[in-house]
Design a protein with these regions (language model features):
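N-terminal accessory segment detector
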Residues: 1-108, 130, 151-152
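Short, solvent-exposed loop/turn elements at beta->coil junctions and helix N-caps
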Residues: 132-137
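Coil-to-beta-strand transition motifs
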Residues: 128, 139-143
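Active-site helix/loop of acyl-thioester processing domains in fatty-acid/polyketide metabolism
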Residues: 108-126
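C-terminal edge-of-domain segments
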Residues: 143-152
Length: 152
């Protein structure tokens, strides 16, 4: 089975269709793209955002204060908080244009956002963190919710 390629100048609609087809095809072959999508998400995070986040963490007295500073700096969706010892990240809307371009985007697409959070918090805390997708807008939920753990 051939997955194909996409032109580097493809429109966002063509990109969305390609990604969705890729995820659906690989999933049907029992190949799951979780790691690949998470790496892609990590690439979407700017080095400047990481630098700012590290500075905010350095001047914070605790995780709750750090998350409030990230919210004020508009890093991470503006809705980060602690619940039951985990960092909870909530998006009230989908920030990515790709899934909006096609109907029935493969739910694995949101591993991209999980990768974004994974890179952000792993870089700031200088250790690997665990990111769990609780639910997403692509999944039909009213908001995206991610849990970040293993950061302490």
């Amino acid at each position: 089975s051939k997955i194909g390629f996409i032109d580097e100048n493809a429109t966002p609609l063509k990109q969305a269709r390609y990604i969705n087809e890729l995820l659906n095809t690989t999933e049907s072959m029992k190949i799951y793209m979780t790691d690949t999508m998470r790496k892609c998400g990590g690439c979407c995070l700017s080095t400047n955002a990481i630098k700012i986040a590290k500075k905010l963490y350095a001047k914070s007295n605790d995780i709750a204060e750090f998350l409030n500073l990230l919210n004020e700096a508009d890093i991470g969706g503006r809705n980060l908080h602690i619940f039951d010892g985990k960092i909870i990240a909530v998006y009230k809307k989908c920030y990515c244009n790709i899934p909006k371009k096609v109907e029935n985007m493969n739910k694995k697409y949101c591993e991209c956002s999980a990768g974004w959070y994974m890179r952000l918090f792993s870089e700031v805390f200088e250790k690997s963190v665990t990111v769990t997708i609780v639910d997403t807008i692509v999944n039909g939920a009213s908001e995206c919710v991610f849990e970040i753990s293993d950061y302490v």
